[in-house]
Amino acid sequence: MSSVSELGYLGMSVTDLDAWRAYAAEVAGMEVVDEGESDRIYLRMDLWHHRIALIKGDTDDLAYMGWRLGDPTEFESMVEKLTNAGIAVTVASDAEARERRVLGLAKLTDPGGNPTEIFYGPQVDAHKPFHPGRPMFGKFVTGSEGIGHCILRQDDVEAAAAFYRLLGLRGSVEYQLHLPNGMVAMPYFMHCNERQHSVAFGLGPMEKRINHLMFEYTELDDLGLAHDIVRERQIDVALQLGKHANDLALTFYCANPSGWLWEFGWGARKAPAQQEFYTRDIFGHGNEAQGYGMDVPL
């Protein structure tokens, strides 16, 4: 049975391309690629043509997310599997695939209403070295682990878990977090490769489709530089620097120009063979700026 191998790319609808251009390059260290298209720019994190497309729009939210399959045979098998499960799948035109810089593309929607894509054959610009937007000591963790992970809006956690299992992901609840109101949050984490998780959900009601995108540096010093820049620019920090219990990553969460969160990280462990759960993080991750959907005690 075919399974997706990585979270390959994101498309984001943004209202302020200029703000994003500066943030992505000067804060995160991503390479900004402007090909003269009036409505979009691209962000590189490695040798792919892009990992993130920033598309000028009327909203600030996730526009789509792309899950990779290995080849045309696996792609066709996945389309068939999803269709047989009663999920509406539209195989995209050649023009739409070219727009995504892939060889094959299909579109569908997950149970939370999040625009989802499966694809194969991304364009890799091996002739163009990655050039970070600011000085960096290392690179981003991508390769077979994909872009990073996303926390998505899902009203029905079980339906979402079943959907992502169809795509080939594995996982379960990894935290039981006791909230001030007496309720217990039980976020659900799923992986499809060595990255500890590529998608998660179950944080409760969300205004936007996406709560945060996490990406990871290969070098601790790059996380430290990013943290310094965020503090110098007085960018809202929702969760202070801390270490997660599940993936052991050292991270912090700060606002992006679209009003949701990017999680900057380093040092995550690989996905374990068996599941376990935690009641709190190892240290840090104290709540700071409110209103970004991470007002939970970690």
From Swiss-Prot:
Source organism: Sphingobium xenophagum
GO molecular function, one term: oxidoreductase activity, acting on single donors with incorporation of molecular oxygen, incorporation of two atoms of oxygen
Annotated protein name in UniProt: 1,2-dihydroxynaphthalene dioxygenase
NCBIfam families membership: 23dbph12diox
Repeat listed as a keyword: yes
Expression induction or repression: By naphthalene-2-sulfonic acid.
SUPFAM superfamilies reported in the protein's UniProt record: Glyoxalase/Bleomycin resistance protein/Dihydroxybiphenyl dioxygenase
EC number: 1.13.11.56
Family membership noted in the UniProt record: Belongs to the extradiol ring-cleavage dioxygenase family.
Domain named VOC: residues: 6-121, 146-267
Function in brief: Involved in the naphthalene and naphthalenesulfonate catabolic pathway. Catalyzes the meta-cleavage of 1,2-dihydroxynaphthalene (1,2-DHN) to yield 2-hydroxychromene-2-carboxylic acid. Can also cleave 1,2,5-trihydroxynaphthalene (1,2,5-THN), 1,2,6-trihydroxynaphthalene (1,2,6-THN), 1,2,7-trihydroxynaphthalene (1,2,7-THN), 2,3-dihydroxybiphenyl, 3,4-dihydroxybiphenyl, catechol, 3-methylcatechol and 4-methylcatechol.
Pathway: Aromatic compound metabolism; naphthalene degradation
Binding sites annotated in the UniProt record for Fe cation: 149, 212, 263
Swiss-Prot/TrEMBL cofactor(s): Fe(2+)
KW Iron (keyword) present: yes
Catalytic EC class: oxidoreductase
Gene3D superfamilies from the UniProt entry: 2,3-Dihydroxybiphenyl 1,2-Dioxygenase, domain 1 (3.10.180.10)
GO terms, biological process: naphthalene catabolic process; xenobiotic catabolic process
Keywords attached to this entry: Aromatic hydrocarbons catabolism, Dioxygenase, Iron, Metal-binding, Oxidoreductase, Repeat
